[in-house]
Amino acid sequence: MAVPKRKTSKSKRDMRRASNSKFVAPGYVKCPQCHETKLPHRVCPDCGHYNGKEVIAAE
């Protein structure tokens, strides 16, 4: 059975655990119609356009 030869330090242990919990911000793109930021592959919440067409009526 595999056994560690040396004790893993708290720093090494914490760095290993922290690498799995990095915060990744979503990539934003600019809407080609109103130039506001929006999430990709979604209808623009400001103007209601998607893929060059008005999908929902914006107020």
Swiss-Prot record:
Entry superkingdom: Bacteria
One Pfam family here: Ribosomal_L32p
Keywords (A to Z) from UniProt: Ribonucleoprotein, Ribosomal protein
Location of the region described as Disordered in the Swiss-Prot/TrEMBL record: 1-21
Biased segments, Basic residues type: 1-15
Gene Ontology biological process terms from the UniProt entry: translation
Gene3D superfamilies to which the protein is assigned, alphabetical: Single helix bin (1.20.5.640)
GO molecular function, one term: structural constituent of ribosome
Name of the protein described by the UniProt record: Large ribosomal subunit protein bL32
Provenance organism: Alkaliphilus metalliredigens (strain QYMF)
Gene: rpmF
